[in-house]
A protein has these predicted regions:
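Flexible, glycine/small-residue-enriched loop-and-beta-strand segment within the central core
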Residues: 1-9, 18-107
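Short N-terminal binding/cap micro-motifs at the start of the first secondary-structure element
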Residues: 14-15
Length: 107
């Protein structure tokens, strides 16, 4: 592996996966024949299927599932923000009690 890759021990990488430089992978799963571009981070409990292309400067957070044969364009960011800065109609700041984080599935 390249010195420009950071891959945790618990990452599952399929066959014939192509990894560019400056990639961080933590506790995720990458399917066969998938290509990951430069400056990509994929966090724990995220799954990328087979035959996918994840373009450069992409951030995939915990809980995201990308199925087989999916293209993700440049600079796509999936977020899991437990402290959003949204407000209620009366102007009070919303808290984590106002939000429910759901897994994301991309087909």
């Amino acid at each position: 592996m390249s010195e420009f890759l950071s891959i945790a021990d618990d990452v599952k990488i399929g066959e014939n996966v192509k990894l560019s430089k400056f990639i961080n992978l933590y506790g995720c799963s990458i399917g066969d024949n998938t290509k990951i571009g430069t400056f990509v981070e994929i966090q724990k409990n995220a799954t990328v299927g087979k035959n996918c292309k994840i373009s450069s400067h992409t951030f995939i957070c915990e809980g995201v599932t990308i199925e087989d044969n999916v293209f993700i364009g440049h600079s796509v960011t999936f977020i899991n923000d437990t402290y959003p800065r949204a407000t209620n109609p009366d102007g009070t700041l919303q808290t984590e009690d106002n939000w429910q984080v759901e897994p994301i599935l991309i087909k």
